[in-house]
Amino acid sequence: MDRVLEYEIPSEYDGANITTVLKQHFKISTNLIKDLKKYKEGIQVNGEHKRVVDLVAKGDVLKITIRDTVSENIVPTDIPLDIVYEDEDVLVINKPSNMPTHPSMGNYENSLANGVMYYYKSKGEERVFRAVNRLDKDTSGLMSVAKNSYIHARLGEEIQKKELKRKYMCIVCGDVERDGTVDAPIRRADGSVINRIVAPDGQRAVTHYRVVKRYGEYTLLEMELETGRTHQIRVHMAYIGHPLVGDWLYGTEDHNIAKRQMLHSCYLCFTHPITGQIMEFKDEMAEDMRAFIEKLS
């Protein structure tokens, strides 16, 4: 599905070439500029097709059309979605636990991507599924989905620049004495596709945690990610001796205690790439985590 953006050229870009405007104002990547050049409607000024080397003048209207296709390898599946926010560019969804973000081997039709593609199809929209902040299968809560490649790239830049803020609530084993930060590099474990470990040759990973309440053998924490490595919170908390309750991979699996790792994405904040508005979303703790806490109280 096409996304059309228009911009009236101000005096600061009077006499500039289109490439300059695309990169400085729209912050469009070189790869996306190449895509825009492939079709006539990609770049227009005052309704006429233009090249990126052409110059613009104050008062000109620059229009770009971002063309999208459809994720043909993702089967649209009628899965109920808890949509927290939606506009022309972004979806914010409250993902339940026991639902992977993407399809995988042996699970082709029951992921969030399948549900989102069905939702797009029901609205007559052809789009590619583009998750911005991916959540693990058994992690619940807020996550964002970009509706086109431009928004996906811009929000990805916000993550790289640490401008997109994410906070989580989790329940860990043991009595965590005080707030703290784990700054420990993470990499994939040798011989494993899934398992991650702390290792000197890993990628830098930083997790901040705050004690919300202690329950003797367990502690409720608020987590804030400075980086976004796979399984980062789970790996870091296990590394300091406080694995997440119910984490079968990095802690102890006991379905009598918890059926999944007690981790919920409760806060998401980013700057909207089109409007410049600060988008802030909050969600309370997941119901199963709340029930677990109530049993401890």
Description of each model-found segment:
Residues 1-297:
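RNA pseudouridine synthases
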